C-alpha cells in the first residue's frame, strides 16, 4: 500500500526576544520581548507499506520538507538585524528524511525437520535512518560602542570562493573555507543569510535478532540482541560556526554528542543513541 500526503503549518505573532544596546549607559543591553516571530513548514510525505506476508513486513517513509522562521529558539535575535533579515531555514530544518524498516518472522517448522526446533520463535528487525544535515549560521565577534559582542554578527559572503574545502585530515573529509567569509563592521550584519549552510547528514542501520519462549498461556520471555549503527558508519556533528575559532569549519565530535547523548546530566547513554559508534545490547523481557 502506498500513500502520498502534504503537511503545512504556519505560525504568526510568535514571542521572540530582541536585544537593544544603548551603549555605555547604566544598562548596556535591553531585552525586548515582542511578537514578531514567524514560522512556516511545508512537507511532501511518501509512504509505502507491505503487509505481513510469509513472515515479512516492511515500510518505507520519505519526507521532503522545508521549515522556515526568523527565530527557532528563545535565544536573542542577532544584533542589528530586523526580524525579516533573520528569515531563513529553521535550526532544526531537515530537507530530506528517509526511514525504511523490515521485520521477518521465521516460519514454524515441524520439530522433525532438521533445525526445525532451533528456528522456532526467531525473528529479525532492521531499520535504516538517513537524512540531510542541519543548517548553521556562520558568526563572528565584533566591537561596538566599547562592548565586545560575542558571536553576534554574520559575515559577508566572498564571491567566487567555495564554501567547502576537501580535507582528508578533518572529520567528514571537508571543512568550511575561511576565505569564503569576510567580517563586517559593527553593527551591520553581512550578506550571508541565517542558517544558509547545510552541514553533515546522518545515516545508520539498526538491527535486532530476537527469540520468544512461551512460558504460560499469557506469559512469554523474549531475548533480543540489538546492534545500533550496525555498519559503524561515521556520523559527525555540525561544523564549528564561529569565524574566530581556531577550529572554524571543522566537526569536532560525533553526532550523538551534539544531540545531547552523553553530555553531563542528559541521562542518555551516548553509545546507544542516533549518530554514535556501533554498539551492542542484550535484553531479556518478560511479556504478560
Describe every region a protein language model picked out:
Residues 1-288:
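Short, solvent-exposed micro-motifs at the edges of structured domains
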Amino acid at each position: 500500500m502506498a500513500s502520498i500526503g502534504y503537511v503545512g503549518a504556519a505560525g504568526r505573532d510568535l514571542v521572540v526576544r530582541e536585544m537593544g544596546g544603548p551603549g555605555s549607559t547604566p544598562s548596556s543591553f535591553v531585552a525586548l520581548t515582542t511578537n514578531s516571530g514567524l514560522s512556516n513548514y511545508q512537507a511532501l510525505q511518501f509512504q509505502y507499506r507491505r503487509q505481513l506476508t510469509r513472515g515479512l513486513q516492511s515500510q518505507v517513509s520519505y519526507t521532503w520538507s522545508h521549515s522556515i522562521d526568523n527565530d527557532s529558539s528563545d535565544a536573542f535575535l542577532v544584533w542589528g538585524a530586523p526580524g525579516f533579515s533573520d528569515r531563513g531555514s529553521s535550526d532544526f530544518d531537515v530537507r530530506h528524511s528517509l526511514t525504511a524498516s523490515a521485520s521477518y518472522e521465521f516460519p514454524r517448522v515441524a520439530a522433525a525437520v532438521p533445525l526445525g526446533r532451533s528456528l522456532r520463535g526467531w525473528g529479525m528487525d532492521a531499520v535504516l535512518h538517513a537524512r540531510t544535515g542541519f543548517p548553521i549560521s556562520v558568526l563572528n565577534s565584533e566591537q561596538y560602542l566599547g562592548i565586545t559582542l560575542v558571536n553576534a554578527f554574520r559575515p559577508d559572503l566572498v564571491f567566487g570562493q567555495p564554501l567547502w574545502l576537501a580535507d582528508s585530515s578533518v572529520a567528514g573529509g571537508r571543512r568550511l573555507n575561511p576565505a569564503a567569509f569576510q567580517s563586517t563592521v559593527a553593527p551591520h550584519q553581512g550578506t550571508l543569510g541565517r542558517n544558509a549552510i547545510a552541514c553533515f547528514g546522518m545515516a545508520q542501520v539498526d538491527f535486532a535478532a530476537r527469540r520468544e519462549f512461551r512460558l504460560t498461556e499469557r506469559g512469554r520471555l523474549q531475548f533480543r540482541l540489538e546492534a545500533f549503527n550496525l555498519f559503524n558508519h561515521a556520523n559527525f556533528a555540525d561544523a564549528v560556526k564561529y569565524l574566530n575559532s581556531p577550529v572554524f569549519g571543522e566537526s569536532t565530535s560525533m553526532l550523538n554528542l551534539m544531540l545531547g547523548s552523553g553530555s553531563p546530566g542528559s541521562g542518555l547513554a551516548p553509545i546507544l543513541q542516533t549518530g554514535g559508534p556501533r554498539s551492542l545490547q542484550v535484553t531479556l523481557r518478560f511479556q504478560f
